[in-house]
Amino acid sequence: MKEYRVYLERARSRQQDFLYPLIFREYIYGLAYSHIDRSIFVENGGYDNKYSLLNVKRLITQMYQQNHLIISTNDSNKNPFLGYNKNFYSQIIAEGFAIVVEIPFFLQLSSSLEEAEIIKSYKNVRSIHSIFPFLEDKFTYLNYVSDIRIPYPIHLEILVQILRYWVKDAPFFHLLRLFLYDFCNWNCFIPTKKSISTFSKSNPRLFLFLYNFYVCEYESIFLFLRNKSSHLRLKSFSVFNERIFFYAKREHLVEVFSKDFSYTLPFFKDPNIHYVRYQGKCILASKNGPFLMNKWKHYFIHLWQCFFDVWSQPRTININQLSEHSIQLLGYFSNVRLNRSVVRSQMLQNTFLIEIVSKKLDIIVPIIPIIRSLAKAKFCNVLGHPISKPVWADSSDFDIIERFLRICSNLCHYYHGSSKKKSLYRIKYILRLSCIKTLACKHKSTVRAFLQTSGSEELLEEFFTEEEEILPWNFQILSLICHSKSFTSHGFHSNRIWYLDILFSNDLE
């Protein structure tokens, strides 16, 4: 049991037990100010005129007084005591909460990275594309996969209670609870998706922290049982209702279930199971049959219902055979394709035909969603036909080409790990022709006349030459679009390169 206690230890010595005083530090709100959209401050008359730490302190004081004549969630967004926009100050305080509560977790993360001696390769650790080399190495040996949607909404009171285990500061969480209930209007017992959407848009930093913390908490329990529990018999997960007393309950878990329940569900350790999470979904893949996958399915359902009080339907978890199911992950469609080949073998005077089945991970670019995104950004219509972008016509020719180059480079870098490159050719064609039509629209000319204009071809050639310097050698073949040549390079079609330094994708704008 000592081993389990060490495994679940939350580095108590590093915990910041006094976060409450930081709420009243002016530099915290200086950091919060820099994270909020500037458009909000334009409506409020500017930072120097209306934002001050004194107003924030007054607003916090009124939260404790419970005076609904001063602070309320009625139809008025104006605080009569402060005279300014209440939503503006609630967003400032939410940013302050997010910055303060992130401090102990950031210190713990930095310390753990230094101890593991992986700080030098931290970029690859953060990379979203590092998932795909993992899939290529592991998924071809697996048979079944389960698509899981992480359920939400979860009540904020449960998040606050779980967060209290990490940071021992009662006044801070009392103030956080008052803020969430008074300003976020989450007094209902079960928050709706509409309220969560409103909260995520008005306070994105705090919302992302609370959501990621919720996911991290359920994954810590899942990984603990996955890595440390073997031949564990359990039927219900109600024993995990209080996270603080997890150690004692875990110690007597097997004994309690063996005595109190006449029927128990065997739970065996699976060494060939793999777990991948991306945004609000996760993937569970295993080499074993569907019987064990169904056990994990019921485990997740009971975990969310009993520990987080989140209702999860069994239909949100689908179990499929990997060779017959495509996984939508990180903007790709991934599946395992079976390649069958026949080998003729001859021994003395006898000839044998041997059928060999090999597995290959196919990662395909979903061209239809990309065309929808390009159409939404006004680069083409819904059918994928390129159109001009007159909004950019006021910019210089160099700026227009640079914008198209940046978008094209981002898309090509991101989808360069695809097994088939035909979709990339079409994306390149749409952006290139949209660029030409935009330039022709700016100069009030036709596409043909613009291309025949002196210096235009050199300008476009410089545009694609700059791209060749950015992309690797096997991607330079895309520059042939400018010269209307075909794509027959076998190396470009077969090679696959994952850019592990991609941390996020830019908007199409």
Curated annotation (Swiss-Prot):
Highest taxon of the source?
Eukaryota
One GO term describing the cellular component: chloroplast
- Keyword Phosphoprotein attributed: no
InterPro entries linked = Domain_X, Maturase_MatK, Maturase_MatK_N
Q: What keywords sit in the KW lines?
A: Chloroplast, mRNA processing, Plastid, RNA-binding, tRNA processing
Matching Pfam families? Intron_maturas2 (PF01348), MatK_N (PF01824)
GO annotation, biological process: mRNA processing; RNA splicing; tRNA processing
Q: Where in the cell is it found?
A: Plastid, Chloroplast
Which GO molecular-function terms appear in the entry?
Answer: RNA binding
**PANTHER family in the cross-refs:** MATURASE K
Task: Tell me which family the UniProt entry assigns to this protein.
Answer: Belongs to the intron maturase 2 family. MatK subfamily.
Q: What does this protein do?
A: Usually encoded in the trnK tRNA gene intron. Probably assists in splicing its own and other chloroplast group II introns.
Q: What is the recorded name of this protein?
A: Maturase K
Q: Which organism is it from?
A: Trifolium semipilosum
Name of the coding gene: matK
